[in-house]
Structure formats: structure tokens, C-alpha cells
Amino acid sequence: MQGLNADEVLRLLRSLIPGELATGRGQRGDPPEAQDLCADSRLDAEPIRADSLDRLNLASALNRFFRLHETGVEDRLLAVRRIGDMAELIADASQHTSGLTFSTSGSTGTPQPHHHSWAALTQEAEALANALGSHPRVIAWLPVHHLYGFVFGVALPRALGSTVIESHAAPTALFREPAPDDLIATVPARWRYLFDSNHRFPGGTGISSTAALETACRNGLLQAGLDALLEVYGATEAGGIGLRWAPSEDYRLLPHWHGDATATSSALNPDGAAVTVAPLDRLQWRDERVFRPTGRIDDIIQIGGVNVSPGHVARRLESHEAVAACAVRSHGEGSRRRLKAFIVPARSDADPETLRQTLENWIWEHLPAVERPTDLRIGTELPRNAMGKLQ
């Protein structure tokens, strides 16, 4: 893979534009839906209707993601209004760029950019294609502007020579037009939705990433007709690192990775360029190719396939003038995990119910879904155990 074609770029724009507009606009209006965007959609017309500041922010985001600064054409995006023309411009420029820049997601502070070369993306896609075998159709039910979404929804279909069903059309394909040889790519929360919906599969293979699948959910999906389900372990910083076909199995490194007890490294590119990644999880190594994650090194947890820091959410809540102190923890397991918060009011005479309603409204307006505590408890001091640690 060296660069993208216009159809692939259009798929990425349908994923990127709504998210970037939502970020830039905050609570000012709803962003367009991906299914409403096509090649003839215009930035200055419905459903996008971007003003000059929207267009400037969007151009900056696209320049960063597609690395257009390497080509000298980045200024031309500001003059383009039609989405199809934008896709053509970016596709042509991508033939001369080094790769793409993906950002970490979640509540871990400012998103960090990570460059992935075309060679590295191709190598990972080809390794996955070898593991998965032939599939004429890929149902990519995940955002393709994130690393896993791009690999599963753009690079892997190219490596397989498969047609692609985009995320906004995935539910229709799954529920009304399933095929026995589909490759279904999505995240644990959506696999859980399919399991809870008692969805039946006519066969096909699944691929999942961002977090481990619950064993009961995985087994239920296989009993519902899915032939196999592959889990990919990795991170935005590194891409896919290991694969496993069953929760009872350990992960096996992809062919281009090498491991040891303290770090995982690989010669990623055909030109010999290497990358060394310190693991974000504690890894128990069976041998130099096989490992099992045993927990995070930091406080990050997975909610809805997104990395979330309870400590960061607590600090956000403590920024509210009515909150003196806050502790945030998770409750629930797997794809049903959410946050709960214990609040100490800034005023000792605060009415608990009034404060709860005030904070619930503030949380809804200021925090994304994965960071919103669904259970607020209010008391005079934070709960601690006998050792003085927060509970």
C-alpha cells in the first residue's frame, strides 16, 4: 500500500468529518451523519454547513491525519468545497506521503499523534489477511479514522481484495443481508449488542479489537452461527501486536514482532526501520512468541472500546465549583462497564438531590459518553479503607 484511492479517502472523510465538526463545534448544533455524506456533498451546504472557522479547523485536522504537509498541497484544502473533489485531492497527494497520523482516543489527556507508515500498515494488513483467509466482503462496523478501523476497514479489505460495507450500513448488512463468508470487524461493545440481540449468523468470521471479549459473549456468538472470532491485541502507538482465536489461548505475536519480558519490538518496514514499544499492560510471556496480558500498568480502563482514565474524569468533576473532592471508579464488567463517582460537595449545606441534578446536567453537556458516570453518590468525605486508600 502506497497511498489511497479516492473511494478509500471518501470512506475516511465520512468517518472523519462528523467527529471533527463535533469537536470543533462543541454543543453548537449536531454534526452530519456519515450516511448523509457523499461525493457531491458540499462543506458550505446542508447537511455539513461549515462556516469559515469550521472549514479552517477541518482543514487542519485533515492535513494532520493525511500528512499533506509532506506534499505542499495542504493550503488547497481551504479552497475546496465539494467532498468528492477533496477526496481526489487527498488521494493524489497520498501517493507522495509517508503514511497516516492516528491519534490516541479517550480521557488520557491531549490526544497523542502516532505516525504509521504505508509500509507498516501494509505489513499488518497482509499478516491479518494471511491469518483470516479469503473473504469476499468485509463488514467494517467501526470508525475507520481510528487505527484499528483503518486497518480492518481499509487496509485489510485491500489486502484481501474484498468489497467493504461501511460502518453506517453495517447493521442493515448484518441483520437483513448476511452472507456465510462475511468478515465482520467491530469492537466488543457491538459484539455484545449482537449477542444480547440474539442475532443469528449464517456463518462468517469475526475480528475484534480494543479490549478482550467476555468469554460468555464470545461463546454465545459462536453458538449463534459465527464460524470463528479473532481477537487482536495492540495499541494506537504500535498497531496490532498479537492474535488469538479463543480466550483460553494466549496471544501469539504477528510475524514481524519480537518480544521479551520488558518490551516488544519489531522491524516494521521492509527498509529495516525498527520500533520499540514499552507495553501498556503487564505481559506474562510463555516464550518469545506467546504472551498473555494480566492488567494495565496505569489506571486506564476500557469503556465502549475507548481508553478512559478514572483519575482524569475525577479531575474534570473537581473543576466544577460545587465539587470539593471526587473519586471515580468503574462498575460492571466487559462491554457493560461504566463509571461511578463519589462527590464531596464544596458547601456543607448543599442539598444532595439538587447537587446531583446539577452535576448530571453538567456531565451530559461537558463529558463524552464513555466518561460520564452513570451513578453519582454524595457524601461528606471520600470513602477510604483501613489503609487510607480510596475505595
UniProtKB/Swiss-Prot annotation:
InterPro entries per record: 4_coum_CoA_lig, AMP-bd_C, AMP-bd_C_sf, AMP-dep_synth/lig_dom, ANL_N_sf, ATP-dep_AMP-bd_enzyme
E.C. numbers: 6.2.1.12
SUPFAM superfamilies (UniProt xref): Acetyl-CoA synthetase-like
Catalytically driven reaction(s): (E)-4-coumarate + ATP + CoA = (E)-4-coumaroyl-CoA + AMP + diphosphate
Principal EC category: ligase
Coiled coil regions, renumbered to chain: none
Keyword Glycoprotein tagged: no
Biological process, per Gene Ontology: phenylpropanoid metabolic process
Signal peptide from the UniProt entry: none
Gene Ontology MF terms: 4-coumarate-CoA ligase activity; ATP binding
Keyword annotations of the record: ATP-binding, Ligase, Nucleotide-binding, Phenylpropanoid metabolism
Pfam families documented for this protein: AMP-binding, AMP-binding_C
NCBIfam families cross-referenced by the UniProt entry: 4_coum_CoA_lig
Function recorded in the entry: Converts p-coumaric acid into p-coumaryl CoA. This is necessary for the activation of the photoactive yellow protein (PYP) chromophore.
PANTHER family tied to this protein: LONG-CHAIN-FATTY-ACID--COA LIGASE (PTHR43767), NONRIBOSOMAL PEPTIDE SYNTHASE PES1 (EUROFUNG)-RELATED (PTHR43767:SF1)
Family (UniProt): Belongs to the ATP-dependent AMP-binding enzyme family.
Protein name: 4-coumarate--CoA ligase
Gene giving rise to this polypeptide: pcl
